[in-house]
Regions:
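Short S/T/G/P-rich N-terminal loop/turn motif that feeds into the first structured element of a domain
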Residues: 1-54, 59-70, 94-98
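C-terminal structural segments of small proteins and small subunits
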Residues: 65-93
Length: 98
């Protein structure tokens, strides 16, 4: 059953955040992750307007998405945004069965 990595970000240092963003695509692919939406046009319909970048990644399974996030490779890449590049909230959401 597919699962979705939903992320919302606020970027503080674009150069540091870009280092993170450049490293992530091959890591996601290694775990079967497929970007469905990333940094495009958005409109906040309800709630606080604290975030300015939104990402949706599809994984074949919930477990693969969690394994990707927990991987050493992803955690090393995430250091660039965690060290002042930005703040991110990430949620894994299991999809509906077919």
């Amino acid at each position: 059953m597919p699962a979705y990595w939903l992320a919302r970000s606020k970027v503080f240092d674009p150069a540091e955040y870009k280092k993170y963003a450049d490293l992530v695509p091959p890591i996601l692919a290694k775990f079967g992750g497929k970007p469905l939406a990333r940094g495009g046009r958005f409109q906040i319909m309800e709630g606080p307007e604290d975030f300015q970048r939104f990402v949706v990644i599809e994984f074949p399974t919930f477990e693969q998405g969690v394994a990707c996030f927990s991987s050493e490779q992803y955690q090393n890449a995430a250091k660039f945004r965690r060290n002042g590049g930005g703040v991110v909230e990430i949620v894994m959401l299991e999809g509906l069965g077919q």
